[in-house]
C-alpha cells in the first residue's frame, strides 16, 4: 500500500490517532466524512479507486492531522476501496503496445534503429486514454504501471522529443501516471519506479 505517512509530521500522526471519523459516505468519486465531536469535515476526491485529493475545512497550510485521521480510517476499512476482481487479458495489452511500437519502425529504424514517433503518436494517445484507462477501471493497477513505464521509455527517447506530437502524448501519460504513484493499490517499489519514469519524461518540459 502507498506509504502515506511521509506527508505528515509525527505530531500530526499522533494527534490523528485520537480522532474518529463519522458519517463516512462515498458517492461516485467523492468521499465525505466528519471528525467526531468537532466542526471539521473531510472531502476526498477519488481517482482510479484510490484517494487522490483530500480537502479539510480546518484551513491549515499543508497536510493536517484530520487528513491523517482519514488515512488511518482507510487502513482500518479496506472495503472502502475494494476493487471487483475481473479477468484481465494481459497479453492483449502487451501485444497492443508491441503493435504500436512496431508501427514506428520506418526507414530510419531499418538503418539506424530510430523509431518514427509521429507514426506512433496517435495510437499511443488512444492506448493511454482508452486501453490503460479501461484497465485501471477493471482493477489492473500493477499492469497499468508496467505499461506506462514502457510508454515512458518511448517518450524519453532523444529523437521522440523532437516530434510535434510528443507533448500531447506526454501530457496524456502524465495525467494517467501521476495519480498511480499515490495509489493505495500498488506498493512503494512500483510507485517509485513509475515516479522515476515520470521524471524521465517531464525533464523535457511537460
Please provide the spans of the model-predicted regions.
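Long, low-complexity, compositionally biased intrinsically disordered regions
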Residues: 1-206
Amino acid at each position: 500500500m502507498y506509504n502515506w505517512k511521509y506527508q505528515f509530521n509525527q505530531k500530526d500522526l499522533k494527534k490523528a490517532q485520537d480522532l474518529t471519523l463519522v458519517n463516512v459516505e462515498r458517492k461516485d468519486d467523492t468521499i465525505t466524512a466528519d471528525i467526531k465531536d468537532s466542526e471539521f469535515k473531510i472531502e476526498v476526491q477519488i481517482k482510479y479507486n484510490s484517494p487522490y485529493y483530500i480537502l479539510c475545512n480546518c484551513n491549515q497550510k499543508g497536510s493536517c492531522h484530520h487528513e491523517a485521521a482519514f488515512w488511518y480510517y482507510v487502513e482500518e476499512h479496506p472495503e472502502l476501496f475494494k476493487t471487483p476482481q475481473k479477468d484481465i487479458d494481459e497479453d492483449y495489452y502487451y501485444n497492443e503496445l508491441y503493435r504500436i511500437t512496431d508501427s514506428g519502425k520506418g526507414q530510419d529504424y531499418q538503418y539506424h534503429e530510430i523509431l518514427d514517433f509521429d507514426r506512433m503518436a496517435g495510437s499511443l494517445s488512444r492506448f493511454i486514454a482508452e486501453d490503460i484507462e479501461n484497465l485501471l477501471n477493471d482493477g489492473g493497477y500493477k499492469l497499468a504501471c508496467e505499461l506506462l513505464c514502457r510508454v515512458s521509455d518511448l517518450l524519453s527517447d532523444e529523437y521522440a522529443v523532437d516530434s510535434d506530437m510528443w507533448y500531447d502524448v506526454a501530457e496524456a501519460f502524465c495525467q494517467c501516471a501521476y495519480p498511480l504513484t499515490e495509489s493505495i493499490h500498488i506498493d512503494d517499489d512500483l510507485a517509485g519506479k513509475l515516479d522515476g519514469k515520470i521524471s524521465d519524461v517531464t525533464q523535457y518540459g511537460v
